[in-house]
Amino acid sequence: MTTLTAQQIACVYAWLAQLFSRELDDEQLTQIASAQMAEWFSLLKSEPPLAAAVNELENCIATLTVRDDARLELAADFCGLFLMTDKQAALPYASAYKQDEQEIKRLLVEAGMETSGNFNEPADHLAIYLELLSHLHFSLGEGTVPARRIDSLRQKTLTALWQWLPEFAARCHQYDSFGFYAALSQLLLVLVECDHQNR
């Protein structure tokens, strides 16, 4: 990625972690349709590989703003996609895709982090991977830890996530009838792919 700073990429990961970790509340729903978010989306679109995915997400948000009971509908989508059985869902856990659920724990230890007691999900939840990537990008920008060490851990995390993220995103597209979470997963997929290539 050429135009986004490490801190900006960290913010995108943190934002996506939040959206994949719990249902949107009224405040978040208002925020994603705000002028401030439109500016943020414009910044993301300055990164050519992200432009199409951001446009798709903006289209979903525009449709969402005229949807009756948007928050309740999105909550139902979230529940159906991420909290039900895996028959017609996109479970946000590495272990749901036959991946080693212990890998993220090892990566967190290596980063000097641990999961919060406030987050009542297994450690292999997608949001944990995204929070770790956010932390690593912020650390790159601070310069307090050798960049080579952070970058090595970032690459390990991206590799572990990439083992199952494409299937997760495909399942979001398959089962998210409205498309908001499908669009979010597509943005995440492109972001991770770009980040992984930016060695």
Curated annotation (Swiss-Prot):
HAMAP family: TorD (MF_01150). It comes from Escherichia coli O8 (strain IAI1). The gene is torD. Involved in the biogenesis of TorA. Acts on TorA before the insertion of the molybdenum cofactor and, as a result, probably favors a conformation of the apoenzyme that is competent for acquiring the cofactor. It is found in: Cytoplasm. This is Chaperone protein TorD. Keywords: Chaperone, Cytoplasm. PANTHER family: CHAPERONE PROTEIN TORD (PTHR34227:SF11), CHAPERONE PROTEIN YCDY (PTHR34227). InterPro entries: Chaperone_TorD, DMSO/NO3_reduct_chaperone, HscB_C_sf, TorD-like_sf, TorD/DmsD_chaperones. Belongs to the TorD/DmsD family. TorD subfamily. The keyword Cytoplasm applies. The keyword Acetylation does not apply. One of its GO terms (cellular component) is cytoplasm. Gene3D superfamilies: 1.20.120.1820, HscB, C-terminal domain. GO terms for biological process: protein complex oligomerization; protein folding.
